């Protein structure tokens, strides 16, 4: 096979379609040798097919489990540290106490010690539970009592606090004594009145606590309080102080007549510095006023959590929980009495039936608080005397449990306060507590810094920590054992992504000064100006660009076109009028970091000095990577000699986020060999060319392109895996790339190891309009402006926003939701976005959809109460009207609205969940770029004498739109549901269209061939347009016209019809490109070929050992133990172990009472848990399973999807050791495919009326095709599916609905292919008939079938007749 050929590829995350074509667009066929023990020694195959595989999955689920395991381990370690401190003293009191606690979960017969865990006897145990119904009763008693307590009780209380220690979101101290809102409000008023004696505030009669702690938005609370104070305004000084206390961001500029804004926000890291700046301007006499506002803020925050008076108790949290317990008891007593009196018939159902969502189901069953409230509310509404209970229910405060989702809101400082109080009380009686007080408190407060990471020893791929010594790490020796600096450096290296252009170089931080200079110059380089006396617009010179950066960008955070005209061209160049092009109203790029650092360092010369570039870059890197102030301080110490304490303090508080896409080496490191200039040098000054970044790296006259290509060359073999692993992209993308490369390698081998002329890859990417900008921020802004205007909201006036800020997801969602919570009818606070949760409407457990369409912004506590499905019906009822308003204003899409309201329609169905899997295919868009680069570097490895790459193989990348249009224009329609041939057909059509285009328009190689970027003006080759249009837009029009040479006639915009020749040639060489008579017939023939090589990749299963649900104890040998030595019959366990692969075993087993040995041949599933012991010694493993005289050489490993052939070509794939799947593909002639497509798209056909009429006429004239298609399905089903009952149902339903419209019949027939499709059987609907799946739950028939081992393309195969194995 020495003819020229090309390869077409259609790449997805679940499939790779492939085809080989000749110069005449034919698919060659070839005879292949068949290995094995069958009579078949050769087979003729067409070189077209598709590889199917299970898509690669992210490590997210594994990571979540790993982090949960770490969390539980660390919690257990905390308890061990506490027990260690208590052990000696506890041994004197009760030496088996810790042993009894350790055994408390075990059933009685497994316990080695007394069964009563606390006191070891029933009398004391009962007395304890009567005295302390909850752990919080014990905690409060110990905090408030001065009496000596039993050491065991002290341990229990401390252990509870250390085990459930609260969150670490609030830094520093949090004083529970500051929780008296009224008292601290009066203190604020008094402090204010001392300063402003002439205009005092009269706050008598104001119920500050009720107003400031109300469950309303902060702004509403502010308004309500100011309304109680005559003469005060919400933006006056006192109003702004209250706003500050509430967590808002007031501006004190007008209060103190300042020249600049003076905004303060307590939750900001920079609050202390911002306050210092303000006090420096207004005087220190106001310091106490701001301190009083801060104390009031702490009180408001805590009052939301703690609902008891801290003067009565030093245990506010425990007291609040006891109050909750007591109220629960009182409300339950009342509820029981009311039900007994008024609805006695309901009493049993509510209080005893755990299967219902009543009180019994709520306490002992699985009913959530929300479900219980939904159940009990109508019952309460029917009865008299329930008013108070209903008020509590509506406030979500009725019959609350001790452990609820909002316990997550308790800061660790509250637990620490109670722990400290207990130690203080009891250390007089137990001196060891005094000696170890700091150690015990450290157990509660210690957290491993995130930049140190997991504390694993050895070669864990997840850990990067560096040790100073090999000691065991504890909270008390952490600083001595762990090298925090070295660990932080490793953290940096792990966290930073690689530059896609130079794969070994790390990208710069987004706020790097160098990166910002690069973006500014890259934008300036395409700016043109024209003024009087100039014939045409000119680019800016190098001197002009430098002057503009110094004059405008270094003095303004944002630079506008108006400033460019007025402050530069008018004042410096003295142009009275000038027109600017290449930039809209303002520049996107800015020197934001320069301005930040200038404000802090206040030394312009230092910032402008190039010798300080490394220092400044390192500072920005530190401020981007680390949140931990201690580590920032440690890393910035290096520069302490350069800056004073004030500057260091301000630098430490500065935070940056985000990463750029390019490395320092790419921007300002690699140099053009001839000129010695870097890319940044060219952007600053490039003569008349004024090339931007993309032009510079693709210009053949410069050496950047060559340097980048060399850096990207991927090797062969093992390094291929490594190279693909290092690419940016999801695991699904990477798996698709690896399979594609393997397919291409095998096809080159099949073709005699000489390389193809072309490899054509479908590149799915949407057209973009350059003028609109590649960023979507402007489109986001436009969407918000139009939607908010439609709603009539004032939100954009109250909180203006710039389009670049809308890249922040939470901020974008805030505006899309008009500043309101999506699940509860409450306002959200724009200043507290970090406290809120972004929630997935369809949970990630069902669909990893991270689009804005699947996200809402909601308060954390409400979000936690939501079920693991779509938002509940109760939420839908409350919020649907509001969601409809957002839908009407186009702030949410119809899809988002449908998902939000799905609970009305029964929540997520199995069909939905199946659809979610298909939707993941969106990831295919980035995949082909990576494949093109890898294939190009693997195929083209030779260089000429000038060290220029010789491109032997052209890797052509196609937009999916081209082939899609080709199919529709020439009626090569695709119906995906029929079979998997469409992957192969797409690959074939990619090859046809790609090679024809290159033949017809060789000058356009730069548009299609990877790595070829010759400078041809695309716009000259398309229909001329009067106006100048952007390049991406030009591409779109170009692509819509480029396909015209395939047509026999084209219709121009004015309606004129032009004929085209039947034989298209290349204008310069005269070579025939497309013979319309011959080549369309060839394409039609290929698309009708019945023999297409469809291969399902066999895969050994990995992952979890079994299903995760813990099943209750029962007498079953099938349950897997939860822990070692835990009998599932006592403790329950897991079921459904995951089978890694199956094995064919030929051996003997004992049968009957006489235990006579009998020969067997059977499949055995090897679970993931068993895999290592099986592979270590297969014979020992199988003998332990009861097999004797195992024939080792006949053991065959059979991964999932192993293929077997039975009678009449019927095929089955292995699903597991006990189940099979369908293994054949129904090859439907293309005339039927076209008919089904047209019939099912009857009312949606796009095209001219005449064209559509013709298609509809074709459908009407070929109604009889319906019968023929059903006949094909029926014959195929009888031969290979063997589901007679299902087929009878289908034929009966078909005859019943024969008179239905053709479109309806065609749509339903398309559903029928679920019956015939390759793979796992599935249920489907045919009209109103549900056809259940026919499962193949026995694997016995394949034991004597032919096992087919296929290569990745399916062209090479080995056939093993299993019936010939294992005879006596």
UniProtKB/Swiss-Prot annotation:
Variant or mutagenesis effect after changing residue 70 to A: No DNA cleavage
Transmembrane segments: none
Residues binding Mn(2+) 1: 10, 762, 766
Residues covered by the HNH Cas9-type domain: 770-921
Effect of gene knockout: Loss of correct processing of pre-crRNA and tracrRNA. Loss of immunity against a plasmid with homology to CRISPR spacer sequences.
Documented effect of changing residue 982 to A: Decreased DNA cleavage. In vivo, loss of Cas9-mediated CRISPR interference in plasmid transformation
Region spans: Recognition lobe: 56-718
Chain sites annotated for binding Mn(2+) 2: 10, 766, 983
Region (PAM-interacting domain (PI)): 1099-1368
Outcome, altering residue 854 to A: Decreased DNA cleavage. Processes guide RNAs correctly. In vivo, retains Cas9-mediated CRISPR interference in plasmid transformation
Motif PAM substrate-binding: where in chain: 1333-1335
Region (RuvC-III): 925-1102
Domain of life: Bacteria
Cofactor(s), names only, from the UniProt record: Mg(2+)
UniProt-recorded Gene Ontology molecular function terms: 3'-5' exonuclease activity; DNA binding; DNA endonuclease activity; metal ion binding; RNA binding
Regulation (activators, inhibitors): Only has nuclease activity when bound to both gRNAs (crRNA plus tracrRNA), which results in conformational changes in the protein and formation of a central channel which binds target DNA. Also requires interaction with PAM to trigger catalytic activity. Nuclease activity is inhibited by EDTA.
Active site: 10 (for ruvc-like nuclease domain), 840 (proton acceptor for hnh nuclease domain)
Use in biotechnology or industry: Coexpression of Cas9 with an artificial single guide RNA (sgRNA) which fuses the crRNA with the tracrRNA in human cells has shown it is possible to target and modify DNA sequences of interest. Cas9 plus the 2 sgRNAs have also been expressed individually in human and mouse cells to achieve DNA targeting; cleavage efficiencies of the artificial sgRNA were lower that those for systems with the 2 sgRNAs expressed separately. Microinjection of Cas9-encoding mRNA and a synthetic sgRNA into zebrafish embryos induces targeted mutations.
UniProt family annotation: Belongs to the CRISPR-associated protein Cas9 family. Subtype II-A subfamily.
Domain notes: Has 2 endonuclease domains. The discontinuous RuvC-like domain (approximately residues 1-62, 718-765 and 925-1102) recognizes and cleaves the target DNA noncomplementary to crRNA while the HNH nuclease domain (residues 810-872) cleaves the target DNA complementary to crRNA.
Quaternary context: Monomer. Binds crRNA and tracrRNA.
Protein purpose: CRISPR (clustered regularly interspaced short palindromic repeat) is an adaptive immune system that provides protection against mobile genetic elements (viruses, transposable elements and conjugative plasmids). CRISPR clusters contain spacers, sequences complementary to antecedent mobile elements, and target invading nucleic acids. CRISPR clusters are transcribed and processed into CRISPR RNA (crRNA). In type II CRISPR systems correct processing of pre-crRNA requires a trans-encoded small RNA (tracrRNA), endogenous ribonuclease 3 (rnc) and this protein.
Database matches in HAMAP family: Cas9
Name of the featured protein: CRISPR-associated endonuclease Cas9/Csn1
């Amino acid at each position: 096979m020495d003819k020229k050929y090309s390869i077409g590829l259609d790449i997805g995350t679940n499939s790779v379609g492939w085809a080989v074509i000749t110069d005449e667009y034919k698919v060659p066929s070839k005879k292949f040798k068949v290995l094995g023990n069958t009579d078949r020694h050769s087979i003729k195959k067409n070189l077209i097919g598709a590889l199917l595989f299970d898509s690669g999955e992210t490590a997210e689920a594994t990571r979540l489990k790993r982090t949960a395991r770490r969390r539980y381990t660390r919690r257990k370690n905390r308890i061990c540290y506490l027990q260690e401190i208590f052990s000696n003293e506890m041994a004197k009191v009760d030496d088996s106490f810790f042993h009894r606690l350790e055994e408390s979960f075990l059933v009685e017969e497994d316990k080695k010690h007394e069964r009563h865990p606390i006191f070891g006897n029933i009398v004391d145990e009962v007395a304890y539970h009567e005295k302390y119904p909850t752990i919080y009763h014990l905690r409060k008693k110990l905090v408030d009592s001065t009496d000596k307590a039993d050491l065991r009780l002290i341990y229990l209380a401390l252990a509870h606090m250390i085990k459930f220690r609260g969150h670490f979101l609030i830094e520093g101290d949090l004083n529970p004594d500051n929780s008296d809102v009224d008292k601290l409000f009066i203190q604020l008023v008094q402090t204010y009145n001392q300063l402003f004696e002439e205009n005092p505030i009269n706050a008598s009669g104001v119920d500050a606590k009720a107003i400031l702690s109300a469950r309303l938005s902060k702004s509403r609370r502010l308004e309500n309080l100011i309304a109680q104070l005559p003469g005060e305004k919400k933006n006056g000084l006192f109003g702004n102080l209250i706003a500050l206390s509430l967590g808002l961001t007031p501006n004190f500029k007008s209060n103190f007549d300042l020249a600049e804004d003076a905004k303060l926000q307590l939750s900001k890291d920079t609050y202390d510095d911002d306050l210092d700046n303000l006090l420096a301007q207004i005087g220190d006499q106001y310091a106490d006023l701001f301190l009083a506002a801060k104390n009031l803020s702490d009180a408001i925050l805590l009052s939301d959590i703690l609902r008891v008076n801290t003067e009565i108790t030093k245990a506010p949290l425990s007291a609040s929980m006891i109050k909750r317990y007591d109220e629960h008891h009182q409300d339950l007593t009342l509820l029981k009495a009311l039900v007994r009196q008024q609805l006695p018939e309901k009493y049993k159902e509510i209080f005893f039936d755990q299967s219902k969502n009543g009180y019994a189901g709520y306490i002992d069953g699985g009913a959530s608080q929300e479900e219980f409230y939904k159940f009990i509310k109508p019952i309460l509404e029917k009865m008299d005397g329930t008013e108070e209970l209903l008020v509590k229910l509506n406030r979500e405060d009725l019959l609350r449990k001790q452990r609820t989702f909002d316990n997550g809101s308790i800061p660790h400082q509250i637990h620490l306060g109670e722990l400290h109080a207990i130690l203080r009380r009891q250390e007089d009686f137990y001196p060891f507590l005094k000696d170890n007080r700091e150690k015990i408190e450290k157990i509660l407060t210690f957290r491993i810094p995130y930049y140190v990471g997991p504390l694993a020893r050895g070669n864990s791929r997840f850990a990067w920590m560096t040790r100073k010594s090999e000691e065991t790490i504890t909270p008390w020796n952490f600083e001595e054992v762990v090298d925090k600096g070295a660990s932080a450096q490793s953290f940096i290296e792990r966290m930073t992504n690689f530059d896609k252009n130079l794969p070994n170089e790390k990208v710069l931080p987004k706020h790097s000064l160098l990166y910002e200079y690069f973006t500014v110059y890259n934008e300036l380089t395409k700016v043109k100006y024209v003024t009087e006396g100039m014939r045409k617009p000119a680019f800016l010179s190098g001197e002009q660009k430098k002057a503009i950066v110094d004059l405008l960008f270094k003095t303004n955070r944002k630079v506008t076109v108006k400033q460019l005209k007025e402050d530069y061209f008018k004042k410096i160049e003295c142009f009275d009028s000038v027109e600017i092009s290449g930039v809209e109203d303002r520049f996107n790029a800015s020197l934001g970091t320069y301005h930040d650092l200038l404000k802090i360092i206040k030394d312009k010369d230092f910032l402008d000095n190039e010798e300080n570039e490394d220092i400044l870059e390192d500072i920005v890197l530190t401020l981007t990577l680390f949140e931990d102030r201690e580590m920032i301080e440690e890393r910035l110490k290096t520069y302490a000699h350069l800056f004073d304490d004030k500057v260091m303090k301000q630098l430490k508080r500065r935070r940056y986020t985000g990463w750029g896409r390019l490395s320092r080496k790419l921007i300002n490191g690699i140099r053009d060999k001839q000129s010695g200039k870097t890319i940044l040098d060219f952007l600053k000054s490039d003569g008349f060319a004024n090339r931007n970044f993309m032009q510079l790296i693709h210009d053949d006259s410069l050496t950047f392109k060559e340097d980048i290509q060399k850096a990207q060359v991927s090797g062969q073999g093992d390094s291929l895996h490594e190279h693909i692993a290092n690419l940016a992209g999801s695991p699904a993308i990477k798996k698709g790339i690896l399979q594609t490369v393997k397919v291409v390698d095998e096809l080159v081998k099949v073709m005699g190891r000489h390389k193809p002329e072309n490899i054509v890859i479908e590149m799915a990417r949407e057209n973009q309009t350059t003028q609109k900008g590649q960023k979507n921020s402007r489109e986001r802004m436009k969407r918000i402006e139009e939607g908010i205007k439609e709603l009539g909201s004032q939100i954009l006036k109250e909180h203006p926003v710039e389009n670049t800020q809308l890249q922040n997801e939470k901020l974008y969602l805030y505006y899309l939701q008009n500043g309101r919570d999506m699940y509860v009818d409450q306002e959200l606070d724009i200043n507290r976005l970090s406290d809120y949760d972004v929630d997935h409407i369809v949970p990630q457990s069902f669909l990893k959809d991270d689009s804005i369409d699947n996200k809402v912004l909601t308060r954390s506590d409400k979000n936690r109460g939501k079920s693991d499905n779509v938002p509940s019906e109760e939420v839908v009822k409350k919020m649907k009207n509001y969601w409809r308003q957002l839908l009407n204003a186009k702030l949410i899409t119809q899809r988002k609205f449908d998902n939000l309201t799905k609970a009305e329609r029964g929540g997520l169905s199995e069909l939905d969940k199946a659809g979610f899997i298909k939707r993941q295919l969106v990831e295919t868009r980035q995949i082909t770029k990576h494949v093109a680069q890898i294939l190009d570097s693997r195929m083209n490895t030779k260089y000429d004498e000038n060290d220029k790459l010789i491109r032997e193989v052209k890797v052509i990348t196609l937009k999916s739109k081209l082939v899609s249009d080709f199919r529709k224009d020439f009626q090569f329609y695709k119906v995906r549901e029929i079979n998997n041939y469409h992957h192969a057909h797409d690959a074939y059509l990619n090859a046809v269209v790609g090679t024809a285009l290159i033949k017809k328009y060789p000058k356009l190689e730069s548009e299609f061939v990877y790595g070829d970027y010759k400078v041809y003006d695309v716009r000259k080759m398309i229909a001329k347009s009067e106006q100048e249009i952007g390049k991406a837009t030009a591409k779109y029009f170009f692509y819509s016209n480029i396909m015209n040479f395939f047509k026999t006639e084209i219709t121009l915009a004015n309606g004129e019809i032009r004929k085209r020749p039947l034989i298209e040639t290349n204008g310069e060489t005269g070579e025939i490109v497309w013979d319309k008579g011959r080549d369309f017939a060839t394409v039609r023939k290929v698309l009708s070929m019945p023999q297409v090589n469809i291969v399902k990749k066999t895969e050994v299963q990995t992952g979890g050992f079994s299903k995760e649900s813990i099943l209750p104890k029962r007498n079953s040998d099938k349950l897997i133990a939860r822990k070692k030595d835990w009998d599932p019959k006592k403790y329950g366990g897991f079921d459904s172990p995951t089978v890694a692969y199956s094995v064919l075993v030929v051996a003997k087993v004992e049968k009957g009472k006489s235990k006579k040995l009998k020969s067997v041949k059977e499949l055995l599933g090897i679970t993931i848990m068993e895999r290592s012991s099986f592979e270590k010694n297969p014979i020992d493993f199988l003998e332990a399973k009861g097999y004797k005289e195992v024939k080792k050489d006949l053991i065959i490993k059979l991964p999932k999807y192993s293929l077997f052939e039975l009678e009449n070509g019927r095929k089955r794939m292995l699903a597991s050791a006990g189940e099979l799947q369908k293994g054949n593909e129904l090859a439907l002639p293309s005339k039927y495919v076209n008919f089904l497509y047209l019939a099912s798209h009857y009312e949606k056909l796009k095209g001219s009326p005449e064209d559509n009429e013709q298609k509809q006429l074709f459908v009407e004239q070929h109604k009889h095709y319906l019968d023929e298609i059903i006949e094909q399905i029926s014959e195929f089903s009888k031969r290979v599916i063997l589901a007679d009952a299902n087929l009878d149902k289908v034929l009966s339903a078909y005859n019943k609905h024969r008179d239905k419209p053709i479109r309806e019949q065609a749509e339903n027939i398309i559903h029928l292919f679920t019956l015939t499709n390759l793979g796992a059987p599935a249920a489907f609907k045919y009209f109103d008939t549900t056809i259940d799946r026919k499962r193949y739950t026995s694997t016995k028939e394949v034991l004597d079938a032919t096992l087919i081992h296929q290569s990745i393309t399916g062209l090479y195969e080995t056939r093993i007749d299993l019936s010939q194995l294992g005879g006596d």
